[in-house]
Design a protein with these regions (language model features):
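Acidic/His- and Gly-rich active-site-bordering loop/insert found
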Residues: 1-102, 118-125
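Acidic/histidine-rich catalytic neighborhood of metal-dependent amide-processing enzymes
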Residues: 105-159
Length: 159
């Protein structure tokens, strides 16, 4: 399936996932993993015992001198905040985009993921690793889960 490389279209899709901390992120993780696979990456969903997951996508030859880009898929709750529009619908007002997570951190996820099809993935001489975690907003729980299972699932990563 060919997906739209437009980062704004992907951001709209990502913002629509209500990935409030402590809630499942499996749907957004599946979209991001699929995009990475379509771009030539080897992906893994690293699931935790509470039904959460992290996404790991690797491109290029395995190495310890490549680069890791890391981000999180969860957002802070919207309860008690004065939103003038649905926080889980991306809207444009006066040339700016508004939606929960558009700046922290779904905008970054959309930008990186949308750029993947334009990268010369098969020409990489060093590894590029994308790590998208869950529950960063509430104590970096996804990162802790990743660290606990690092050697078992990831092996050496770029330093």
């Amino acid at each position: 399936m060919k997906t739209d490389p437009d980062p704004i279209a992907l951001l709209k899709e990502l913002v629509a996932f209500p990935t409030v901390s402590h809630r499942p992120v499996s749907a957004i993780a599946a979209v991001l993993a699929q995009r990475a696979e379509e771009a030539g990456g080897q992906t893994e969903l690293l699931e935790s015992s509470d039904g959460k997951c992290n996404v790991i996508a690797r491109f290029g030859p395995p190495s310890t001198d490549g680069i890791v880009l890391s981000g999180h898929m969860d957002v802070v709750p919207t309860e008690g905040q004065d939103w003038t529009s649905d926080p889980f619908k991306l809207v444009e007002r006066e040339g700016r985009l508004f939606g929960r997570g558009s700046a922290d951190m779904k905008g970054f996820l959309a930008a990186v993921t949308s750029a993947l099809p334009q990268l010369p993935i098969h020409q990489l001489k060093r590894e590029l690793v994308l790590i998208w975690t869950h529950d960063e907003e509430v104590g970096c729980l996804g990162s802790q889960h990743l660290a606990d299972r690092w050697a078992e699932h990831l092996g050496p990563l770029p330093s």
